[in-house]
Amino acid sequence: MPIIPKPKSQTKGSVESSKKESRVKMETSDAKYMVGNEVKTIKFLDMRGNIATSARNSLNISPGVFAVNPFLGETLAEDTFNILDYAGLGNVDACASHLSRSQELREQVTEKTLREVPISDSYVLKVVSNLQATTVQNVVSFNKACAVMSFNILRHTTDEMYDWTKNEYVSLGLKEKAAKVNPNIINRLAGQINLSPQSPYYYLVTPGYEFLYDAYPAETIAMTLVKMAYRKTMNLPDSMKDSDICSSLNAKINKRHNLAVNNIDDIIKQIGKKHIEDMYNTLTQNIAMSGKESRNVETAQSFLALIESFKTTT
């Protein structure tokens, strides 16, 4: 039987020697970094102790300087948009026509980034997709564009607006010369809550209605309450929380009132709870009869009645 030689034992000295050989020598001025699987060394040439006093280095890499420019979120650019600046700039039929096809407008703005939307013979909105900030008055986001058009209609159909200095709604004096909106133009969003085209608030139900807060605070709050109470009728996804529904209007309220120091309940009291309640009732008076689901129920009831009539004739 062949004798298998035993492996030579490694002495303590040889182990320490191999460890020393595996160590990477590191100078005080060195910095090791990885490029793929390879370790590279950059040596800083100007040192004071273990502090590099400049970026001058053995690889001649020019580092540049990262500027002190803090990210401040929403405060980077102040939103100068004021719905009141757009009073009287839109023709009611032009505005109503665009709002009747708001979904198509949204899709075109998203696809093309920029769309021109003439709201009168002399005023054209430039609608920009995902607009963050601008000081150009007629350059607006999709939601702001819809609010501007809604505002120019509501001024004529309601003949009033909220006056924050008086804390009340005041007449605009347009009743005798108020423009009439073409009744054949359909606001499909208002149709979701079965709001009559004859209602002065027919064009309140638009994307971006929250931007109307400075002119119609009770109306915008009531509209938000409708969305919260009738989310399925308004085709809102189940994933959208009540706080999500309120967030856009809350931003407009905060801009005017500073909610850090003012209480939302006091603001509601200032505007008038009765005003909000009346508007909520106006917007929801026919809502139970609206929508595809209720039409299906009505049809089913008629069909059941028809079946019963067959029984009486046989």
Curated annotation (Swiss-Prot):
It comes from the Viruses. Residues 17-27 have a biased composition (Basic and acidic residues). Residues 1-27 are annotated as: Disordered. It is found in: Virion; Host cytoplasm. GO terms for molecular function: RNA binding. Keywords: Capsid protein, Helical capsid protein, Host cytoplasm, Ribonucleoprotein, RNA-binding, Viral nucleoprotein, Virion. The keyword Ribonucleoprotein applies. One of its GO terms (cellular component) is viral nucleocapsid. Homomultimerizes to form the nucleocapsid. Binds to viral genomic RNA. Encapsidates the genome, protecting it from nucleases. The encapsidated genomic RNA is termed the nucleocapsid (NC) and serves as template for viral transcription and replication. This is Nucleoprotein. It comes from European mountain ash ringspot-associated virus (isolate Sorbus aucuparia). The lineage of its organism: Viruses, Riboviria, Orthornavirae, Negarnaviricota, Polyploviricotina.
